[in-house]
From Swiss-Prot:
Binding, ATP: 332, 358-361
Gene responsible for this protein: pgk
Name of the protein described by the UniProt record: Phosphoglycerate kinase
Pathway(s) this gene product operates in, as recorded in its UniProt entry: Carbohydrate degradation; glycolysis; pyruvate from D-glyceraldehyde 3-phosphate: step 2/5
Gene3D superfamilies: Phosphoglycerate kinase, N-terminal domain
The species this protein was found in: Thermococcus sibiricus (strain DSM 12597 / MM 739)
Localization: Cytoplasm
Length: 413
């Protein structure tokens, strides 16, 4: 792959594909974490007198947080200390005229890329490069800088479509993500522990199967809905309330697959031994072997219990490499943040090289000011895809672009 230092950006138009997709409450963006993650790259380009055109998506059609990128431009302006112009267009005449009008060290924010139908579909690179988006903008662009690691598992026009048309370069964030994840995956340091929580159960099953089969993990600790599915696969009854919830989410069908994985790797997958529910207005912890399991019929599980936290924390202390994705429970409710916070604190306090990823995981880390984690990944789905051993279209596109343009005359000039 290229590096940012390979090119001269003076007076060049750079399309910077970022992933600034952020949590929203009451119509307002409530986290600037992903904005801060790309500041280094933007500042580098501005210092080298580039004309920077930023493209990002925000949510997807019909969702409440499917907003314009006007707020994104305002937040970025505030963080950069530089005016970021916003244009409510993507590749139409208004957008193209705004790009043509840019001067060196100026920044333009395009409209939410998913307002264009082409950006809501996934297609091979060959199709993406023939879209209106790529055909209209490529004549105006000199280089593409890709910082959208969080979307690296998607194959959409803005993410891969320019790869064979213009040199596509990983930004500092993309480079950092690839380096950290590769180290964790390939490292021979032991023990290597994976912590899989949250709601992306199928993706987590893919990770568990891949890292255990290829001896990339010594132990997997589970929580969140991932833990629920593995607990059911072990034959425990989690009650009507929880089984109904998993069924509504389409996750019950994954119990059989979890059971197959357990049959092959049983000693290496740990599940919670107790859970926490809300009962009569309080946090109540129920041991799986106790006579109080009837509460699971009435109350949904909201967190792992104290015994599980203690067991997981002891295991994490001895780790050399830790990869964690997803919370242990419903951390948004303070009484049920305990599992997530304590497990992530244990990760931070360990001597291990540690990676934590996933939108909810990142939110909990910042909310509870957890320190000591080696690398906080901006990617959730992309990170899981990587550790599942599957190809990431954006990384493939970066390699394709390098092969196409590595002998280009402008290189290093």
């Amino acid at each position: 792959m290229f590096r940012l230092s390979d090119f001269n950006y003076h007076d060049k138009v750079i399309f910077l594909r970022a992933d600034l997709n952020s949590p929203v409450k009451d119509g307002k963006i409530i986290s600037d974490a992903r904005f801060r993650a790309v500041l280094h790259t933007i500042r580098y380009l501005l210092e080298h007198k580039a004309k920077v055109v930023i493209g990002t998506h925000q949510s997807k059609p019909y969702e409440e947080d499917y907003l314009t990128t006007e707020q994104h431009a305002e937040i970025l302006s505030s963080l950069l200390g530089v005016k970021v112009k916003y244009v409510d267009d993507i590749f139409g005449k208004c957008a193209r005229d705004a790009i043509k009008a840019l001067k060196p060290s100026e920044v333009l924010m395009l409209e939410n890329l998913r307002f264009a139908a082409e950006e809501t579909k996934q297609n091979p690179l060959e199709y993406c490069e023939r879209t209106h988006f790529v055909r209209k903008l490529s004549p105006l662009i000199d280089y593409v800088v890709n910082e959208a690691f969080a979307a690296a598992h998607r194959s959409q026009p803005s993410l891969v479509g320019f790869a064979r048309i213009r040199p596509m370069i990983p930004g500092f964030l993309m480079e950092k993500e690839i380096k950290a994840l590769t180290r964790a995956y390939e490292s021979l340091e032991r023990p290597k522990i994976y912590v899989l929580g949250g709601a992306k159960v199928e993706d987590s099953l893919n990770v568990a199967e891949n890292v255990l089969r290829n001896e990339k993990a010594d132990l997997i600790l589970t929580g969140g809905l991932v833990g629920h599915v593995f607990t059911l696969a072990k034959g425990f009854d989690l009650g009507d309330a929880n089984i109904s919830f998993l069924d509504e989410k389409g996750l019950i069908k994954l119990v059989d697959r979890a059971e197959i994985i357990l049959n092959e790797f049983y000693p290496y997958i740990r599940t919670p031994v107790d859970f926490a529910v809300e009962y009569k207005g309080e946090r109540v912890e129920i041991d799986l072997l106790s006579d109080k399991q009837w509460i699971f019929d009435e109350r949904p599980i909201l967190d792992i219990g104290s015994r599980t936290i203690e067991k997981y924390s002891e295991i994490l202390k001895e780790a050399s490499i830790i990869v964690a994705n997803g919370p242990m429970g419903v951390f948004e409710i303070e009484e049920f943040a305990k599992g997530t916070v304590e497990v992530f604190k244990a990760i931070g306090e360990s001597k291990a090289f540690s990676i934590v990823g996933g939108g909810h995981s990142i939110a909990s880390i910042y909310q509870y000011n957890i320190k000591g984690i080696s690398h906080i990944s901006t990617g959730g789905g992309a990170m899981l895809t990587f550790f599942a051993g599957q190809s990431l279209p954006v990384l493939q596109a970066l390699k394709i672009s390098y092969e196409k343009f590595k002998n280009k005359k402008e290189l290093n000039q």
